[in-house]
Amino acid sequence: MEISHQPVMVDEVIQYLITIPEGIYVDGTVGTGGHSLEICKRISPKGELICLDIDRSSILLAKERLSVFGDRIKIIKESYVAIDKVLKKIGIDKVNGILLDLGMSSYQLESSGRGFSFIKDEPLDMRMDEDRGAAASELVNTLSMERLQELLWVYAQERWAKLIARAIVEERRKGPINSSRQLALLIETTIPVKYRHRKRHPATKTFQALRIAVNKELENVADFLEKCPSFLENSLFFLSQALPL
């Protein structure tokens, strides 16, 4: 499969990440392998890269893309939050650098079929890890209006949070909201008319908030940051790069 996703600012990221060419590095969100490919090109034959991700389909693509590097690279289906357990299991105490590329890849947006995009008509899932947790449709169809409003405001600062939450609750009384397009159309017809045709799609912030909630993105980053000092070599870098919506 041809992979269209290109990592953002890859040269700048790799320049600061790789401080010791023969070191041990972690790509905590390998995705389809864009950053990992460049890391492997720039570390020495004695260097090692550990790749983590929870998206099963992305991992399969990364394994194919990075297979040329052989045993210099380990690809493991696990969250970066569990990096301490992963390192312990493979017998590594310290690493020289860690990369997190937070957010969605274009592959997930365009090809995953999990409802990340409000343009496509797909199941309203939004789980990065299809093997765990509640799908976005479960949140949309079961949370109270107050909780939905809070979620939209806290995770996306959606100015129309109350209107959208009320519309969701009213709509689901008629039947479940199970597709991304169904939800997007509901939001489009809910917000005031003069705000419906601006540059940013009216559903952008709602979809962002749901994705963050479904995947516990903020909680995961907070947990990870608490663990960093225990396995990062002194004075070396932890890089976190968030992709724009």
What do these predicted ranges mean?
Residues 1-245:
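S-adenosyl-L-methionine-dependent methyltransferase catalytic core, i.e., the SAM/SAH-binding region
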